Amino acid sequence: MYQISSSSKDELKRLVARASRAAEYCSHNLVLVVLEPEVRVSLDKDSQIEDVELINVSKSLSQRLVCLSANERIKRLDVEFEEVAEKCSENSWLTKLDLLFEPSLKADPILLLKWLSKSRPVVAIWPGQIYEKTLVYAEPGSEDYRTYSLQELKDIQVVNACNGVIK
């Protein structure tokens, strides 16, 4: 298994802190962190970055949505997502965002994150990759496949920790 070193974790925290400072001056106080898949898995298993609490959004949100009908899930997704986020400290990073891409919920994950970041700073670990100038989730042809041009995301800070670049 790939292990993320403590020096890499420190560098990641520095990159995110820098992007968070820049996000304070944007219309959305949102930082998306893009990691190599192996690093993301390691981070999820290890789940320890000093002074950072990793929040499993899919787990927390699914516990709130499971007792609702399919239509109620669609209607209440934004409210339930906000309630999950409200319980987070300012040193929390949202991870495991995959449930937000569930086609039956008919949601746009970026719009949900933007909406949430209007009222509070949000750091989220993107569950996909960056290919050229596009943020991607899933594979083409998959029902939950999504792409977002980085040009469209001008008002969001994107940390590409795959090569240490901040957009």
Identify the role of each PLM range.
Residues K87-L105:
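Conserved P-loop NTPase "ATPase switch" module shared by AAA+ and STAND
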Residues M1-E86, T134-S149, I156-K167:
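Extended, compositionally biased accessory segments flanking or bridging domains
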